[in-house]
């Protein structure tokens, strides 16, 4: 292997220097300047004799120790620029001089001799750096560097106490670039301890920014008033429009109709004082307070009037309209249930009787009462109930229409006109059930032949009956599952460790039986 010249060694890159050191059998994991020195000593041992500061590894370690001691005393550099070492770039060896300059400035001695020395050293370093680009370093430069490093180490030892007392803010000069700063956090932190804030002042300042409760309540009330007034206006307008639509749809005569009460079946109207036949009808005599204009907007009158007042008289046999269940005989009508305290009496089942000594009265024109003269309509009398008469048969009870509402017509009796002896009675159809004591309502004896002759209300089963208890398939499995679901339908059964252990034991038993059966040639299910 050919030894490269000194100029070639200085011109090589760091990676090439490492490769060269590996081939020469030297340690390659060194810094660039140390690696270059080691290669020079290896290839040119005469340079070792020329350089008195290189004593094997001891001189290198001495310079390293000096450099490390200087770096510890130095303040951290602020610049973060790293220079790229190119092919033509040579490693700098005079990195001690800016440290000397920085130390002399930071100490601040103020002597002219130190300032002149630093100027001279700067000029010499500039000249030396120019010479190094052309030729390798000489022995004189190395002697000077060594003497300078010794002087600076002495000065640093005497001035370390003064530097520690100074603050980091006093450091004005910028150190040499190209090195990553160490312990930058220590220099940036101020030495003063953090004081606790005055929370009272902070709370007072925050409280002054806040709004008072009175102002907030006033603002809230104004907002609520504006919102509620707009909502109220909209409600009133919608109600008014709905009322006007309802009035347009229905005529005035149909706005208010008398409510037909079931209590007026057996009660009569109050006697009227003699009225002329030329009286205005009731729908025209309605007072002004019931008119649509005078009605309150907030009064909600719904147009729905129920026609069915009780559920006992509703027709729930919907199959009569659809005719889809005619093949079944279970839909034969049964008579309505009768109460034991009432007797169902129809006008056809009783003879008519006249009311004695009934005087004629002028009929009042109303919506619920019809005035009939004797010439236009035959007289109809109130039926009387016989005490010993039994209950009406179901066939007669069927004839009464259960879906119609009863028109409450009453007999008007008046004795103000004694000169009229004729009788005027409004038509009356008494379909209500009269009360009677429960003692007279006795149950009849059961007639077996009559019940057998009646058709069945259901479809009987035809064919062979299944055996008793034979319909259940998989009895044990289904019952077991159902019982578990019944007991734990809200809390499902969670698998515990014991359950898993039992299951594992069962699986092992099954596997053992299967292996034994296969070994003996017995098929195991």
Swiss-Prot record:
Residues 58-69, 106-127, 270-285, 476-494 have a biased composition (Polar residues). Residues 160-169, 495-514 have a biased composition (Basic and acidic residues). Residues 46-205, 248-292, 373-397, 451-525 are annotated as: Disordered. Residues 82-92 have a biased composition (Basic residues). GO terms for cellular component: cytoplasm; microtubule; mitotic spindle; nucleolus. Pfam families: NUSAP (PF16006). Microtubule-associated protein with the capacity to bundle and stabilize microtubules. May associate with chromosomes and promote the organization of meiotic or mitotic spindle microtubules around them. Interacts with DNA. Interacts with microtubules, ipo7, kpna2 and kpnb1. Microtubule stabilization is inhibited by ipo7 and kpna2, while microtubule bundling is inhibited by kpnb1. Active GTP-bound ran causes dissociation of ipo7 and kpnb1. This is Nucleolar and spindle-associated protein 1-A. It comes from Xenopus laevis (African clawed frog).
């Amino acid at each position: 292997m050919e030894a490269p010249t000194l100029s070639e060694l200085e011109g090589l890159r760091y990676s090439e220097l490492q490769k060269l050191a590996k081939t020469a059998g030297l340690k390659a994991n060194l810094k660039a300047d140390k690696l270059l020195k080691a290669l020079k000593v290896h290839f040119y041992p005469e340079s070792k004799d020329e350089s008195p500061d290189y004593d094997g590894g001891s001189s290198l370690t001495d310079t390293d120790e000096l450099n490390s001691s200087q770096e510890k005393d130095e303040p951290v550099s602020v610049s973060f620029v790293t220079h790229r070492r190119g092919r033509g770039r040579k490693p700098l060896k005079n990195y001690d001089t800016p440290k000397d300059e920085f130390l002399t400035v930071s100490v601040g001695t103020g002597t002219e001799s130190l300032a002149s020395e630093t100027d001279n050293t700067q000029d010499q370093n500039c000249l030396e750096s120019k010479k190094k680009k052309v030729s390798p370093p000489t022995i004189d430069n190395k002697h000077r560097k060594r003497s300078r490093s010794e002087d600076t180490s002495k000065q640093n030892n005497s001035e370390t106490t003064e530097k520690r007392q100074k603050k980091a803010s006093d450091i004005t000069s910028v150190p040499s670039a190209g090195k990553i700063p160490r312990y930058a956090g220590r220099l940036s932190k101020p030495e003063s301890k953090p004081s606790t804030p005055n929370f009272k002042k902070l709370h007072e300042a925050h409280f002054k920014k806040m709004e008072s409760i009175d102002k907030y309540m006033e603002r809230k009330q104004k907002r609520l008033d504006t919102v509620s007034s707009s909502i109220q206006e909209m409600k009133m307008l919608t109600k008014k429009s709905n009322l006007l639509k309802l009035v347009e749809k229905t005529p005035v005569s149909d706005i208010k109709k008398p409510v037909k009460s079931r209590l007026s079946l057996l009660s009569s109207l109050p006697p009227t004082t003699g009225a002329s036949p030329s009286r205005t009808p009731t729908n025209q005599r309605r007072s002004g307070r019931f008119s649509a204009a005078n009605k309150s907007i907030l009064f909600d009158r719904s147009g729905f009037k129920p026609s069915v007042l009780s559920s006992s008289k509703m027709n729930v046999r919907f199959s009569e309209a659809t005719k889809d269940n005619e093949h079944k005989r279970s839909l034969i009508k049964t008579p309505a249930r009768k109460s034991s305290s009432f007797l169902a009496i129809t006008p056809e089942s009783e003879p008519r009787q006249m009311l004695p000594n009934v005087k004629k009265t002028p009929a009042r024109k109303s919506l619920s009462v019809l005035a009939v003269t004797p010439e236009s309509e035959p007289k109809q009398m109130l039926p009387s109930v016989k005490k010993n008469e039994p209950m009406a048969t179901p066939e007669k009870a069927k004839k009464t229409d259960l879906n119609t509402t009863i028109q409450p017509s009453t007999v008007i009796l008046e004795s103000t006109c004694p000169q009229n002896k004729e009788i005027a009675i409004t038509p009356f159809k008494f379909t209500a059930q009269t009360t009677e004591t429960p003692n007279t309502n006795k149950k009849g004896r059961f007639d077996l032949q009559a019940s057998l002759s009646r058709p069945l209300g259901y479809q009987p089963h035809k064919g062979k009956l299944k055996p008793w208890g034979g319909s259940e398939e998989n009895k044990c499995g289904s019952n077991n599952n159902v019982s578990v679901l019944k007991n734990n339908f809200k809390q499902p059964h969670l698998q515990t460790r014991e359950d898993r252990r039992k299951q594992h034991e069962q699986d092992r038993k099954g596997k053992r039986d299967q292996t034994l059966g296969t070994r003996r040639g017995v098929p195991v299910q």
